[in-house]
């Protein structure tokens, strides 16, 4: 027989050792199911199985080919039985031990002792001298069940009188060897507790050194302390089922490590796992089939496209995108890039762009307005205490200056209704009171040059009325001028922005000229002058 390079070689004998686990045998059941699913030859070619306590029961079931589902169903019933009483498994009315014996009598075949003889090694602790005894010879099914019962018996926990095997009293083998037959060089060790075993939970230890207890290596971690408690006093079934899946995953990780060792070997003499004949490579390596990976890739690409789509989109003609704005036929940027908030700050008539003539026959509609987004102005201190400034909802486009400037002598025109004007001019975003008379013309002439000649005649009158009625409002007006002195205009790429820049530029020059000659008290009218 050739020398074995790595334990688990199917061409040379190897062994599997199960540690004591108590109620945490869910973990070992998950590991056995993983080996059956991914590496069935590993269980078939193993010539020795060793176990103690509940691990001995798992080993016997694995040798006899009994499904772990039946064992887990009985274990679920036993956990529910233990949860009924306050003392749990220490209660005298607990029937957990009797339930397990009845389960073994029911599921084990009659010739199970023949199959397990020489192959199953059960670890026991002799009561008289406390020595560890490993038995592997059975003459009947009852003798096999008695050996398993002695290996699981914990004094006081399971009863007061220990059972006997061949006339000698034995107790749980975990007291003298938690990991049975760990000295076997070809043994693949499976443990519920984190340590140096091949298949076991991997925790982050609190200290770097392991400690030995019951002739077994343990990591000193909070998780291990919790596992020791759960082994004797079972937690909820949800936690126990998590132990099952954890055992399955740890067995898969072990197979991956073995595959890496085999693939990186230069001589290829490390037989396990000989992936083409020994293990299902797709499942052991965690590779997904192409048919399964394609839908996930498409879904991932769709999610990436959906994440980047709202930043910039093409709006078709006539589609308002949920708002009442004008139809746009060119690609526009969304509200996220145009401005942070619509124009909602009070702006004096000096900083307002020149008003466009209103239609005399039809009310003002949004369909005739150009698709231009006006600057976002931060809200300065209000010039009039107690004035409320409503802001348009985010779904509506910002109001243009043509909608803001209206004559105060006539009813203010709005989108849906008309309201009489108050004697004090309102500084809201919809109307700005100013005693100016505007010539009426059709809205079709909107792109034409605005009437700049009338700007110098009407604005001094508006400023004079505002100052004469409330002189203290002049200081905030200067502050507003400084705030909006450099407007930031965001407009559609399809529109020409020259006329907007001209209007703002002329308005700014005229405003500064008017400020220089502006009197603090009302006086005679100054002669009108045209903008240079």
From Swiss-Prot:
GO terms for molecular function: acyltransferase activity, transferring groups other than amino-acyl groups; omega-hydroxyceramide transacylase activity; structural constituent of skin epidermis; triacylglycerol lipase activity. It catalyses: an N-(omega-hydroxy-ultra-long chain fatty acyl)-sphingoid base + a (9Z,12Z)-octadecadienoyl-containing triacyl-sn-glycerol = an N-[omega-(9Z,12Z-octadecadienoyloxy)-O-ultra-long chain fatty acyl]-sphingoid base + a diacylglycerol; an N-(omega-hydroxy-ultra-long chain fatty acyl)-sphing-4-enine + a (9Z,12Z)-octadecadienoyl-containing triacyl-sn-glycerol = an N-(omega-(9Z,12Z-octadecadienoyloxy)-ultra-long chain fatty acyl)-sphing-4-enine + a diacylglycerol; N-(30-hydroxytriacontanoyl)-sphing-4-enine + 1,2,3-tri-(9Z,12Z)-octadecadienoylglycerol = N-[30-(9Z,12Z-octadecadienoyloxy)-triacontanoyl]-sphing-4-enine + di-(9Z,12Z)-octadecadienoylglycerol; N-(28-hydroxyoctacosanoyl)-sphing-4-enine + a (9Z,12Z)-octadecadienoyl-containing triacyl-sn-glycerol = N-(28-(9Z,12Z-octadecadienoyloxy)-octacosanoyl)-sphing-4-enine + a diacylglycerol. GO terms for biological process: ceramide biosynthetic process; lipid homeostasis; omega-hydroxyceramide biosynthetic process; triglyceride catabolic process. Keywords: Cytoplasm, Disease variant, Ichthyosis, Lipid biosynthesis, Lipid metabolism, Transferase. The keyword Transferase applies. Residues 310-322 have a biased composition (Basic and acidic residues). Residues 380-389, 397-411 have a biased composition (Low complexity). Induction: Up-regulated upon induced differentiation of keratinocytes. It holds the Pfam family Patatin. Residues 290-457, 489-532 are annotated as: Disordered. Transmembrane segments: none annotated. The active site is at 53 (nucleophile), 172 (proton acceptor). Its EC number is 2.3.1.296. Expressed in the digestive system. Expressed in the epidermis of skin keratinocytes. Strongly expressed in the granular layer. Expressed in the upper epidermis and eccrine sweat glands of the dermis and in the region of keratin filament bundles, which is more pronounced in upper epidermal layers and in the lower cornified layers. PANTHER family: CALCIUM-INDEPENDENT PHOSPHOLIPASE A2 IPLA2 -RELATED (PTHR12406), OMEGA-HYDROXYCERAMIDE TRANSACYLASE (PTHR12406:SF23). It is linked to Ichthyosis, congenital, autosomal recessive 10: A form of autosomal recessive congenital ichthyosis, a disorder of keratinization with abnormal differentiation and desquamation of the epidermis, resulting in abnormal skin scaling over the whole body. The main skin phenotypes are lamellar ichthyosis (LI) and non-bullous congenital ichthyosiform erythroderma (NCIE), although phenotypic overlap within the same patient or among patients from the same family can occur. Omega-hydroxyceramide transacylase involved in the synthesis of omega-O-acylceramides (esterified omega-hydroxyacyl-sphingosine; EOS), which are extremely hydrophobic lipids involved in skin barrier formation. Catalyzes the last step of the synthesis of omega-O-acylceramides by transferring linoleic acid from triglycerides to an omega-hydroxyceramide. Omega-O-acylceramides, are required for the biogenesis of lipid lamellae in the stratum corneum and the formation of the cornified lipid envelope which are essential for the epidermis barrier function. This is Omega-hydroxyceramide transacylase. It comes from Homo sapiens. The lineage of its organism: Eukaryota, Metazoa, Chordata, Craniata, Vertebrata. The gene is PNPLA1.
């Amino acid at each position: 027989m050739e020398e074995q390079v790595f334990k688990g070689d199917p061409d040379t004998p190897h062994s599997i050792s199960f540690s004591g686990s108590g109620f945490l045998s869910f973990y070992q059941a998950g590991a056995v199911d993983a080996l059956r699913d991914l590496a069935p030859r590993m269980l078939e070619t193993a010539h020795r199985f060793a176990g103690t306590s509940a691990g001995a029961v798992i080993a016997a079931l694995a040798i006899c080919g009994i499904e772990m589902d039946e064992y887990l169903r009985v274990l679920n019933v036993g956990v529910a039985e233990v949860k009924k009483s306050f003392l749990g498994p220490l209660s005298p009315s607990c029937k957990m031990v009797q339930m397990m014996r009845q389960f073994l009598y029911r599921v084990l075949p009659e010739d199970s002792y023949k199959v397990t003889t020489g192959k199953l090694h059960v670890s026991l602790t002799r009561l008289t001298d406390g020595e560890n005894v490993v038995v592997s010879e059975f003459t009947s099914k009852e003798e096999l069940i008695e050996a398993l019962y002695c290996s699981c018996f914990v004094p006081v926990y399971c009863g007061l009188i220990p059972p006997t095997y061949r006339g000698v009293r034995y107790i749980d083998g975990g007291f003298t060897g938690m990991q049975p037959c760990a000295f076997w060089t070809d043994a693949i060790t499976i443990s519920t507790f984190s340590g140096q075993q091949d298949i076991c939970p991997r925790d982050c230890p609190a200290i770097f050194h392991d400690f030995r207890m019951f002739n077994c290596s343990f990591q000193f971690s909070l998780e291990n302390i919790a596992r020791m408690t759960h082994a004797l006093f079972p937690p909820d079934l949800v936690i126990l089922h998590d132990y099952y899946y954890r055992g399955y995953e740890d067995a898969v990780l072990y197979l991956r490590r073995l595959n890496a060792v085999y693939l990186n070997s230069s001589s290829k003499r490390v037989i396990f796992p000989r992936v083409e004949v020994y293990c299902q490579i797709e499942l052991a390596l965690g590779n997904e089939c192409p048919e399964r990976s394609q839908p996930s890739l498409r879904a991932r690409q769709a999610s990436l496209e959906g994440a980047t789509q709202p930043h910039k989109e093409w709006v078709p003609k006539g589609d308002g995108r949920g708002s009442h704005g004008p139809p746009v036929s060119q690609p526009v940027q969304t509200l996220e890039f145009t401005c942070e908030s619509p124009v909602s700050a009070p702006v004096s008539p000096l900083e307002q762009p020149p008003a466009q003539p209103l239609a005399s026959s039809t009310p003002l509609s949004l369909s005739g307005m150009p698709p231009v987004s006006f600057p976002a102005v931060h809200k300065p201190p209000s010039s009039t205490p107690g004035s409320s400034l409503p802001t348009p909802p985010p779904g509506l486009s910002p109001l243009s200056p043509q909608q803001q400037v209206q004559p105060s002598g006539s009813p203010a025109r709005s989108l849906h209704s008309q309201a009489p004007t108050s004697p004090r001019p309102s500084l809201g975003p919809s109307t700005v009171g100013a005693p100016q008379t505007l010539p009426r013309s059709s809205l079709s002439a909107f792109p034409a040059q605005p009437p700049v000649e009338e700007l110098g005649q009407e604005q001094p009158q508006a400023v004079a009325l505002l100052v004469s009625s409330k002189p203290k409002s002049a200081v905030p007006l200067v502050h507003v001028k400084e705030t909006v002195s450099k407007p930031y205009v965001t407009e559609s790429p399809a529109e020409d922005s020259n006329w907007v820049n001209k209007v703002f530029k002329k308005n700014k020059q005229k405003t500064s000229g008017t400020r220089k000659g502006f009197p603090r008290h009302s006086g005679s009218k100054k002669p009108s002058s045209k903008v240079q």
